[in-house]
């Protein structure tokens, strides 16, 4: 097993133990049949080895070596309702008996669309897809057709799916940022034609005045502004005062569409997503992950005026598996679960998330570790600060890169994993509706041991 040269060898002391023997064996076997051994590139980054799992239940998951974890990765946020909820499994099973796919219409798609209309402030009309990446592409096409303009404005460091257009400006290296006033349009992948970059404008997050200047400099050319209401994919940065209202104002003033990417935030902070939580109504909304509870399902929802080109048929939106009945059955169960919880829905994840954040910060202080959790609670990022880095909230991508200590976080995560606490490799944590007080209490006990080990090993190195 090769250890990445990006990190010192002591970062992964667990790699030679037997705790992950079966996962290592399967990963080695997979590389003979699966390109790079994984089916999503980011999974290969997991240390000490990409783990293989056998089953999950509620807030817990078990790997093939029999190790149990309190799961705060929770399917990269898709499993808002926890692992293997019985009602959802039953709904999928009952639908499978009736048919797995028709490439036609069924009543379920109307029922799910009607539930989205009930929940989401901006959902006058709905179209279904299989992934949020597809929805992003559909939203961009629709915005350009609606306005007759070529450019999409997005924020530096933001992730909007893995396709060519979604990755523009995602996590650019510091030596290629460009000027603060004019962030460089970069792409992290080879194989993308240069013309794609020319159809985007990049602005810095959480600077309304800067955003105004960028929009004014491209007046009449921008079709839409796309954004995560809380930038969960990059340090869980909440919008500062005035940012969302400025986006709405500029879109109304210049005839641009406001596109909220609620792939992660949808249903997580409130039944109506971040748009309910923060109090705004976008023109188009991208939904994924929790809308399907772990099955491949996504939706584009929006105002009727913004969806008009699809209604007319002048914008192509198609797909053999769009509105798949198995996925619709799962989504109907998920949305009914959210509706049934009512006002209790946000409190469950919010309260537990805040407790976990506070507990992790207290343990960090106890062990002299510069870990600073930030975010709303149902999703948050545990930021490991570099020596001498400033305290306080991180509010934009450049500040995040300057202040984070990625190798040290990776070491701490391996220590947490050994204790049975699973968070996302880059520092993101999710609270599901299946987590309970016992999970938080137990996770903090385990984290105490992990923090102690990390502090000792990091100091010794």
Q: Where are the regions that the model predicts?
A:
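N-terminal amphipathic/basic-hydrophobic helices that include classical n-h-c signal peptides
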Residues: 1-15
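Conserved N-terminal phosphate-binding loop of PLP-dependent enzymes in the Aspartate aminotransferase
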Residues: 15-461
